[in-house]
Design a protein with these regions (language model features):
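Donor nucleotide-sugar binding/catalytic pocket of nucleotide-sugar-dependent glycosyltransferases
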Residues: 1-12, 282-299, 303-322
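A short alpha->beta transition loop at the rim of the catalytic pocket in nucleotide-sugar-dependent
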Residues: 91, 114, 405, 430-433, ...
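A short, well-ordered alpha-helix in the C-terminal region of glycosyltransferases
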Residues: 148, 152, 158-163, 468, ...
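Short acidic/histidine- and often glycine-rich active-site loop of Leloir-type glycosyltransferases
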Residues: 122-133, 137, 419, 439-450, ...
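Conserved catalytic-core segment of nucleotide-activated headgroup transferases in glycan assembly
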Residues: 7-78, 171-194, 312-322, 328-403
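Membrane-proximal helix-turn-helix segments that form the acceptor-binding/catalytic region
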Residues: 233-237, 250, 266-287
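Nucleotide-sugar-dependent
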Residues: 95-105, 127, 252, 346-349, ...
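Conserved acidic donor-binding segment of nucleotide-sugar-dependent glycosyltransferases
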Residues: 75, 136-143, 153-154, 449-460, ...
Length: 506
């Protein structure tokens, strides 16, 4: 018999603790038959005896437990479990079910993460836990027995004996955007995987923050100068550094003014916006950037200040979402372009001739376009081969990208575009789709041409390499497999540039 299986879950390896308490984790929906009464009794004992123990439920409780030692996250997605485990500094998970179950998905998820787990000696989950090297069987079905187990068990002791890291970083944003997920959420995940906790607030709420609780501040694309100036002044009095995180060349209008999308009416005040960004950058102590090209530009324009590169990486939730996608076999070959915003109209325009040519020559070639891009009128001639999607959530994006056989990443030849990161290559590689991209200094420093992607310096190379990928399925699979392996090794949140870490915590 083959037991139930769940998909990929990353291993959780806590380097240290972020709290001084022993934290018992629960996972899922807590009901009476799932052990809710025992959990309530355990919380009562912890509170009554003033024990340094907390109960943290990743999920929701149907049992009313009104205790300061008990907390719940509320509804969660499966992909969020590893991050929530780290953020709540969970030391050991408890499966408190008093009802014999045939299979427990939550037990399997916890074991896949490599976390210690304890349960009562009933049902199929107990059989799995007995065979697990971090499994603990509680001898009696009672709150007292649970407490004695966590007090005396060596596995629990090893988990809680880790050093407590009190370092903490404050992140400040002006608004939440697609980019802020990469630059803030993923950086926060990198930190918590190193055992460093953080908070994130809006710039308008910083006046409520007790800055003494933090070691440093990271602000992302803030343009509100007066508010940032006040925050910087408070930080300076505490001898605390403020870092500006930025992932686009948007602080020197004269250098980028000729870019096509800036001629749109929605960018009429963009020069003023770039000036505000620059003013905010100037009062900060250092910079965190996403690319080597951006690092070079900032070092030239803000000499004497610290600049560190922290490349965009995939969050644990993003990886889980991507690895659950199943490729669907189809007869046609789909070329995908996942642009996001209309700022990429001119990027697409740069390869329209080569793309139209292959589509007109072969009706079996389809184009899948997602985002706000406005397709050139010439594509009306092949409209039956075109499928379009508007914006989708990042959680849905892997499923959409996986529909493609080839991912397009054209970029205009400008310093603005050279400062952009390899996100689109990474997202496609996660779902085993090969990328063909424009060659510039930045992408050439990342993508290995012919090994884990294709780079094109002119229209002739676009035509040649696109046709090569279309004709050769084994080549597509080879490129995709190499890129996927590299992403899984080098682009995870368990990997972080030590230079970035040292700068933030200096």
């Amino acid at each position: 018999m083959i037991p139930h299986q769940i998909g990929y879950m990353p291993q959780i390896e806590k380097e240290n603790k972020t709290t001084k308490t022993l934290n018992i984790g629960l996972l899922g929906v807590l009901t009476k038959h799932k052990g809710g009464t025992i959990v309530a009794e355990l919380a009562e004992k912890i509170e009554r005896e003033n024990l340094d123990v907390r109960i943290k439920l990743i999920g929701t409780s149907c049992v009313d437990i009104n205790s300061p030692v008990f907390s719940q996250t509320g509804a969660y997605t499966r992909g969020a479990i590893p991050r929530l485990t780290l953020e709540n500094d969970i030391d050991v998970f408890l499966i408190p079910s008093i009802w014999p179950e045939t299979f427990s998905y939550t037990t399997e998820e916890i074991m896949k993460m490599g976390m210690p787990i304890m349960c009562f000696d009933i049902g199929a989950p107990a059989e799995r836990v007995k065979k697990y090297d971090k499994g603990i069987i509680i001898p009696a079905i009672s709150a007292e027995s649970v407490y004695q187990t966590i007090r005396d068990n060596q596995i629990v002791k090893e988990s809680t004996d880790k050093k407590v890291n009190s370092q903490k970083v404050l992140f400040v944003v002006q608004e939440v955007t697609f980019s802020s997920r990469y630059r803030i959420d993923h950086l926060r995940e990198q930190l918590i995987r190193k055992g460093i906790s953080s908070d994130c607030v809006s710039i308008k709420d910083t006046k409520k923050c007790d800055l003494k609780a933090y070691n440093s501040i990271v602000v992302y694309r803030i343009s509100e100068y007066e508010k940032l100036k006040k925050l910087k002044s408070k930080a300076k009095k505490l001898n605390m550094q403020v870092f500006y995180d930025i992932d686009d060349y948007i602080f020197n209008y004269q250098a980028i003014k000729d870019i096509g999308f800036l001629k749109g009416k929605e960018y009429r005040n963009y020069e003023n916006y770039t000036e505000q960004i620059r003013n905010c950058m100037e009062i900060c102590d250092g910079y965190i950037v996403s690319t080597l090209s951006l690092e070079k530009v900032i070092k030239e324009q803000f000499p004497g200040k610290v600049v560190v590169v922290n490349r965009n990486v995939a969050s644990m939730e993003m990886v889980i979402a991507s690895l659950t996608v199943e490729k669907v076999h189809k007869d046609n070959i789909t070329i995908g372009y996942f642009s996001g915003t209309k700022t990429h109209n001119d990027d697409f325009e740069s390869i329209k001739g080569e793309l139209l040519s292959v589509m007109q020559e072969n009706e079996n070639i389809h184009l899948l376009v997602a985002g706000q891009i406005e397709l050139p009128a010439e594509f009306n001639a092949v409209k039956d081969q075109v499928e379009t999607f508007k914006f989708v959530s990042w959680q849905e994006l892997p499923h959409l990208i996986a529909k493609a056989d080839i991912n397009l990443m054209p970029l205009e030849n400008s310093i603005f575009h050279e400062c952009k990161s390899e996100n689109k290559w990474m997202e496609a590689a996660l779902v085993n789709v090969p990328t063909i991209a424009s060659r510039n200094n930045e992408l050439a420093s990342v993508i290995r041409d012919g090994e884990d992607g294709f780079l094109c310096k002119n229209s002739e190379e676009w035509a040649e390499k696109l046709n090569k990928l279309i004709r050769d399925e084994s080549l597509r699979n080879q490129i995709a497999s190499s890129a996927h392996a590299r992403i899984m090794k080098e682009y995870m949140t368990d990997d972080m540039e030590m230079e970035t870490l040292r700068a933030i915590l200096k």
